[in-house]
């Protein structure tokens, strides 16, 4: 037998394989007992491979791990799975992702709960752009690790977001436009006080009113798609509004600017931002149009940009609206909401203050100012400021007892402060004021879970929300999330799919797809490996 060379290690594959074999079989170099069985020889090859691996000599390591695999008795499944996983690690260093995935698959077949192999295969699938397979593997890892490893959870979150965006991009452009519920539409328009198109029709505009002697009003009304659209709006016959506005626009009628803005608004409401933008652009460019119309179009385009995660464009539009119509309270109200989303609380409060100065009766702005101050105090853990904000809420609901939003925001703050009983009372007041507002029932249902761990009552309230408004995507999303926590994945997936079909933006749809894909991955992992996360 030729003794193992003490000279430099050769780079060729043949020499490397020989080194492994000679090291294993040459008993002159083994000070202890001879390597009498295959497993010992396999372990020795693996150990030699580990030394090559640590030295950054990955090709040589691969040959040693291959030798270990060929020597290992097939019944030694745990050892064999380790050798495959080690070889996968070496392939990973060489960025041979297909080989990494193949070796990890062998390792997992031999040892189904082998976390290291599952995670390495997940990373290989990520590199190979196999998102679904990556998600299933990293989901199994998260469950096996009890959701304690930040690295695997970050990968799961990353791939879920990528899958969500990918699916939403395809689905959203082909979705059927869906008109929201009347309650949602009324709530939307109630956030504006300087919006001409949402104001009640003036005397002489309705078709059932007396005509003037000249017959001029009659002619305008009969030919005005915009005035018909306004009448349909008052009748809550929302599905006909876009087509009537289009008639006014096509005819280049007297109310063309108003019709463009109203049509754009309803395009936004049905989630068709691509159709809304040209109409908004046109209104903004009409220098001769009423400045209130142009400012309102800027507010709505700015809000649209924010929904599309374009904060710079959004900020530009709000600032332009403030420049052209500085006395418009809506500009400051909606810009304040934007500032909260951007975590610019002091600027948000300043905007709400300006809105209140211009419209002292604006209950919404006062309630949202209190909530902004509360969030700032809560985040900064400033107890005196928290108390001041809570006192502010009390003053708002006393001054504006008919403002449901005031009670709802106060309830959220009370929940944070674990004043659950009082929060529940606030939600009840919301329901008294707006019995058709499904969102309030969802929040009250979530409160029951947090407060009393009363799952049945919570689900009952969320089911009530769906009964009241079958288009409430928030209710379906919440129900799906609860079902995931209960381990009812099929029901959860059904709820998420219903929410997906109701999503009002591509970004919202992407988030819902992420939730749905997470539930689906857990279902697949349960089937393959018998793994389930802890449930409620």
Per-range role (PLM):
Residues 1-536:
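Alpha-helical tetratricopeptide repeat
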């Amino acid at each position: 037998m030729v003794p193992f060379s003490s000279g430099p290690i050769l780079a060729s594959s043949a020499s490397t394989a020989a080194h492994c074999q000679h090291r294993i079989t040459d008993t002159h170099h083994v000070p202890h007992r001879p390597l009498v069985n295959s497993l010992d020889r396999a372990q020795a090859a693996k150990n030699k491979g580990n030394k090559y691996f640590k030295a950054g000599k990955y090709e040589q390591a691969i040959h040693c791990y291959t030798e270990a695999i060929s020597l290992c008795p097939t019944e030694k499944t745990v050892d064999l799975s380790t050798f495959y996983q080690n070889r996968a690690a070496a392939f990973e260093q060489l960025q041979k992702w297909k080989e990494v995935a193949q070796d990890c698959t062998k390792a997992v077949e031999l040892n189904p709960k082998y976390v290291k192999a599952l995670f390495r295969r997940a990373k290989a699938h990520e590199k190979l752009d196999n998102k679904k397979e990556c998600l299933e593997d990293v989901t199994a890892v998260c469950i096996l690790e009890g959701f304690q490893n930040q690295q695997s959870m970050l990968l799961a979150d990353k791939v879920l977001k990528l899958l969500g965006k990918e699916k939403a991009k395809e689905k959203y452009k082909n979705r059927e436009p869906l008109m929201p519920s009347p309650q949602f539409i009324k709530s939307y328009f109630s956030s504006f006080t300087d919006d001409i198109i949402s104001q009640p029709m003036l005397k002489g505009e309705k078709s059932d009113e007396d005509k003037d002697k000249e017959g001029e009003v009659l002619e305008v009304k009969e030919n005005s798609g915009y005035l018909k659209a306004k009448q349909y709006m008052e009748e809550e016959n929302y599905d006909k509004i876009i087509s009537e506005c289009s008639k006014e626009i096509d005819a280049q009628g007297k109310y063309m600017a108003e019709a463009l803005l109203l049509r754009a608004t309803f395009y936004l409401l049905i989630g068709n931002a691509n159709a809304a933008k040209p109409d908004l652009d046109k209104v903004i460019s009409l220098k001769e149009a009423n400045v209130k119309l142009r400012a309102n179009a800027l507010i709505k385009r700015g809000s649209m940009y924010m929904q599309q995660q374009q904060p710079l464009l959004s900020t530009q539009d709000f600032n332009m609206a403030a420049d052209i119509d500085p006395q418009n309270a809506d500009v400051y109200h909606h810009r304040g909401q934007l500032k909260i989303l951007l975590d610019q609380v002091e600027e948000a409060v300043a905007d709400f203050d300006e809105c209140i100065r211009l419209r002292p009766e604006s209950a919404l702005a006062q309630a949202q100012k209190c909530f902004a101050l509360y969030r700032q105090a809560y985040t900064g853990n400033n107890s005196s400021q928290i108390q001041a904000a809570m006192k502010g809420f009390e003053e708002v609901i006393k001054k504006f007892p008919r403002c449901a939003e005031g009670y709802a925001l106060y309830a959220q703050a009370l929940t944070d402060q674990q004043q659950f009983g009082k929060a529940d009372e606030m939600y009840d007041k919301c329901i008294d004021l707006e019995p058709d507002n499904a969102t309030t029932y969802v929040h009250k249902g979530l409160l029951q879970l947090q407060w009393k761990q009363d799952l049945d009552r919570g689900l009952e309230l969320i089911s009530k929300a769906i009964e009241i408004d079958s288009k409430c995507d928030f209710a379906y999303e919440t129900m799906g999330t609860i079902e995931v926590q209960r381990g009812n994945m099929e029901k959860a997936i059904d709820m998420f799919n219903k929410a997906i079909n109701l999503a009002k933006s591509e970004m919202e749809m992407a988030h819902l797809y992420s939730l749905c894909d997470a539930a689906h991955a857990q279902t697949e992992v349960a089937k393959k490996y018998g793994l389930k996360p802890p449930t409620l």
